[in-house]
């Protein structure tokens, strides 16, 4: 029976009990001692694939730990689950849908049936549609209402229609095509629109409205604001089609807005928003970096898909990262996971992975609606490397919580300045080393003696300088951030999230919690503007409504 129809209680599996027993045996495990005892530890716990090099040797694991985690993956039926997702079974059980983001990066000639229909020709038809549009804009053939070529593209979207495309277009800024600047408008806060509109000219700007329903509140409000601004700047209704296109499955609403049907790029219900950057949602990426680079991005993701499907679990990068997350979250009590990119252009990867991981695995019931028996997805947080060292790394080193971390770093910089990149890389490695090694009381006291402190001063200060160490981390190294490697990196985390959902028996492809907030928001809005005079369901919300109404002007 398919895993998504009859999810297991993972805590009842023999492999889970074996891991519980092993966790007790690992209570006094020391990474420092493990490295001293085994010169081959690094080679035993490293892996290279798809242009990525993973060092997972700085973890609270032995080869036995890895074997036990792999046994867990086998007992939960991970191989069948991977096949179910890739082949289009209804792995999104609550919505009765497949999750086929992997289809978006499959090559021409592949076949994949959904409800008896081969979807691959349609996938590549849309890719050709994107290619044509990108070519026209880059060649200056798409012109605005004053016949000037387009110089600025504004993507209006939120969530998956924003976070993934923004990550990729900024991460690949070194591949940006000259002549077209890409911007993102997501927040309904008017200040964001105000700042953006000051940077662009209506006559040379193309807006992409990205919303599957063409009814997402924030996106629709921003699209309406952009439309009003365009008209106020001298644009006309008759020429509006030159400045607005859409990525949506609601053609009627997009046409009613003023967008021509041939300029509406389709979305499919078998691709979730947080997995959609590979689709027409990635149009701003293609406009930013060019079509050949966009196809390289897809190709990189496809190589990771192939690795994920074919590599044995012991050598499978997404599977290993996922199982390590299960190990810490379910057996060591970790509640969060830090993403620490040591690359300026990857500064938004944490935001994308927050949505990817937390919206996917922030669940408390299994696929069949029964409560989970263990913790599920962690809080994902972090930020750019060296900046974080002077902010929150202190908590990683000496705080009371165990927080696993992923360090992500390139070997080559696109913008070398003196020896800056060598220092950047050194900082990345030294942080993971410090988390692992820590500093003992004896080492702290020895340092203070060398500085000439008295024994009384040493006794007072040494406890503050002790760093526990034994804090786990992974290090992902890429030679250089490229479209192909970035595609593999993002796909790596997509598959990691899926593997964990299979272990926990949850649905990684729905997000009902998000829907509740949307529903309640309408009622609060109606009370704020006075169109609904009934009281809110609770005194706190009503009190805050009254506070707003008593003070808001304009």
Swiss-Prot record:
Pathway note: Carbohydrate biosynthesis; gluconeogenesis; Carbohydrate degradation; glycolysis; D-glyceraldehyde 3-phosphate and glycerone phosphate from D-glucose: step 2/4
Recorded catalytic activity of this chain's protein: alpha-D-glucose 6-phosphate = beta-D-fructose 6-phosphate
Entry's localization field: Cytoplasm
A Pfam family the protein falls into: PGI
Enzyme class of the recorded protein, top EC level: isomerase
EC numbers, comma separated: 5.3.1.9
GO MF annotation terms: carbohydrate derivative binding; glucose-6-phosphate isomerase activity; monosaccharide binding
Name of the featured protein: Glucose-6-phosphate isomerase
Source organism per UniProt: Pseudomonas fluorescens (strain ATCC BAA-477 / NRRL B-23932 / Pf-5)
Species lineage: Bacteria, Pseudomonadati, Pseudomonadota, Gammaproteobacteria, Pseudomonadales
């Amino acid at each position: 029976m398919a895993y998504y129809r009859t999810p297991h209680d993972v805590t009842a599996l023999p492999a889970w009990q074996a891991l519980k027993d092993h966790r007790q045996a690992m209570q006094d495990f020391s990474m420092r001692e493990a490295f001293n005892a085994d010169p081959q530890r690094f080679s035993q716990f490293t892996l290279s694939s798809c242009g990525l090099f993973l060092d997972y040797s700085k973890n609270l694991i032995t080869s036995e730990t890895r074997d036990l985690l792999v046994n867990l993956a086998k007992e939960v039926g991970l191989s069948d689950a991977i096949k179910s997702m890739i082949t289009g079974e209804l792995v999104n059980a609550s919505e009765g849908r497949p999750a086929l983001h992997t289809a978006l990066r499959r090559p021409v000639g592949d076949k994949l049936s959904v409800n008896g229909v081969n979807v691959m020709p349609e996938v590549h038809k849309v890719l050709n549609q994107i290619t044509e549009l990108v070519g026209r804009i880059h060649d200056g053939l798409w012109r605005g209402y004053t016949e000037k070529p387009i110089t600025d593209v504004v993507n209006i979207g939120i969530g998956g229609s924003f976070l993934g495309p923004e990550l990729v277009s900024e991460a690949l800024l070194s591949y940006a095509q000259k002549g077209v600047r890409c911007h993102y408008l997501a927040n309904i806060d008017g200040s964001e629109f105000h700042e953006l509109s000051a940077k662009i000219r209506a006559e040379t700007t193309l807006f992409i409205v990205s919303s599957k329903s063409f009814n997402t509140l924030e996106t629709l409000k921003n699209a309406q604001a952009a439309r009003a601004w365009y008209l106020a700047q001298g644009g006309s209704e008759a020429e509006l089609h030159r400045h607005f296109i859409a990525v949506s499955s609601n053609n009627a609403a997009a046409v009613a807005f003023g967008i021509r049907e041939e300029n509406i790029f389709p979305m499919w219900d078998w691709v979730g928003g947080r997995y959609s950057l590979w689709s027409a949602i990635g149009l701003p990426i293609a406009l930013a970096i060019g079509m050949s680079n966009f196809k390289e991005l897809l190709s990189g993701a496809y190589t990771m898909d192939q690795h994920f499907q074919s590599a044995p679990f012991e050598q499978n990068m997404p599977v290993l990262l996922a199982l390590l997350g299960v190990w810490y979250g379910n057996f060591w009590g970790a509640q969060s996971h830090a993403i620490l990119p040591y690359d300026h252009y990857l500064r938004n990867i944490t935001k994308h992975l927050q949505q990817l991981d937390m919206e996917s695995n922030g669940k408390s019931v299994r696929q069949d609606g029964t409560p989970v028996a263990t913790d599920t997805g962690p809080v994902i947080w972090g930020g750019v490397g060296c900046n974080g060292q002077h902010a929150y790394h202190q908590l990683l080193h000496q705080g009371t919580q165990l927080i696993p971390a992923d360090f992500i770093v390139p070997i080559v910089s696109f913008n070398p300045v003196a020896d800056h990149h060598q220092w950047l890389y050194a900082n990345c490695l030294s942080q993971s080393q410090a988390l692992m090694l820590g500093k003992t009381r004896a080492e702290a006291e020895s340092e203070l003696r060398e500085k000439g402190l008295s024994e009384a001063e040493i006794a007072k200060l040494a406890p503050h300088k002790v760093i526990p160490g034994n804090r786990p981390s992974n290090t992902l190294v890429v030679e250089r951030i490229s479209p192909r490697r970035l595609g593999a990196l993002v796909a790596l985390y997509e598959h990691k999230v899926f593997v964990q959902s299979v272990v926990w028996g949850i649905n990684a492809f729905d997000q009902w919690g998000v829907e509740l907030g949307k529903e309640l928001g309408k009622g609060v809005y109606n009370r704020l503007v006075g169109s609904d005079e009934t009281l809110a369901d609770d005194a706190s919300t009503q009190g805050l409504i009254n506070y707003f109404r008593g003070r808001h002007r304009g």
